[in-house]
Amino acid sequence: MKKIELKNNSLLKDIVTLLNLIIVGYSAILVFLTILSVISYTVLSDRLGIKLNVQFLPSVDFSNWWSVLAFVINLLTASLTIYLIYLARNFIKNLIGGKIFDSSNTQLADKAWKVFLPLTFLSVKVAASGNPITLPFSFNASLSFTPLLGALIIWLMMKILEKGIDIAEENEFTI
């Protein structure tokens, strides 16, 4: 069986480069859309003499607090997604550096599963139709369990890494 060298693995280095581009690009798009959304629904658009129609779902109407809350939840979800990509990039960089059973990997995994938990609850989609006073009225809420499953898998990986670190330390002291 051929041993795979992680330090000189060009595929892993290309993945890190791609993740860097995704992080920078996604962050720039997020900042740009946030600025445009704020400008398009405030007095600034009237002062600048331009009318912008930015479709950053949901559209922000700063006079309606539900709209602002949905906007903040979208920003938070996008920011947490960027942070998860950043953590994955750091994990791959540790693999390239030869740090497999290292405490920094368990710290990254600990941060990652804790980021997945709020993403589970931020993925709730709520839809209401009708008027709650007059019937018919329907209220539907759906929750995606995919981030929760991701949190569980990463937590299990973290526990395996912790056990691997303990075994590696025992082997160092035995020799």
PLM features: residue spans?
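Cytosolic juxtamembrane helix and N-cap/initiation of the first transmembrane helix
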Residues: M1-I39
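Membrane-helix interface/capping segments
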Residues: K2, G49, W66, A78-I100
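Cytoplasmic juxtamembrane regions at transmembrane-helix boundaries
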Residues: K7-L12, Y86-K111
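Hydrophobic alpha-helical transmembrane segments of multi-pass integral membrane proteins
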Residues: V24-V31, T77-L84, W113-V124, I153
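Perimembrane loop-to-helix junctions flanking transmembrane segments
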Residues: T42-N64
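Interfacial helix-start motif at the membrane-water boundary
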Residues: F56-A78
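Hydrophobic alpha-helical transmembrane segments of integral membrane proteins
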Residues: G98-P132
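Alpha-helical transmembrane segments of multi-pass integral membrane proteins
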Residues: L119-I175
